[in-house]
Amino acid sequence: LLPVLVLSILIYKILHKNWRHSHWEVDIIAEKTGTLHFVEVKTRRTKKFGHPEENVNKKKIQNLINAADEYLYQQPQWKKIQFNILSITILKNKPIEYFFIEDVYL
């Protein structure tokens, strides 16, 4: 729910949450100003293992691309797309931190 709230504040229209096809998944598919956004969300409750966005590895990126390809096959009307990462850190007794990386080059 928190990722949807963050994106809503940033004026994104949420189209799908946890969209799946076969074994691929996109955490959030959203639209903003005519562009379709595929958003990978990473959340952590500790900084022990680094920042959440650092856990978006090559395999995850490839799965996101494959899922996006399938989505676009099913919804061919979209001409402009973008990949984003939403990183959320929730630490005890601290304000929630989020870091939104737009237009990630894959």
Predicted regions and their residues:
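Acidic-basic catalytic patches of nuclease active cores, encompassing PD-(D/E)XK
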Residues: 1-17
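Short, solvent-exposed loop/turn elements at beta->coil junctions and helix N-caps
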Residues: 16-20, 86-89
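Mid-chain, well-packed structural core segment of small domains
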Residues: 48-79
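Hydrophobic "anchor" residues on beta-strands that sit immediately upstream
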Residues: 13, 36, 80
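Short acidic/glycine-enriched loop/turn segments that link adjacent beta-strands
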Residues: 21-24, 94
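Conserved catalytic cores of phosphodiester-cleaving nucleases, focusing on short active-site segments
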Residues: 26-47, 56, 64
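Protein kinase-like catalytic core scaffold
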Residues: 24, 35-37, 84, 99
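Domain-level recognition of nuclease-like catalytic cores that cleave nucleotide substrates
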Residues: 73-106
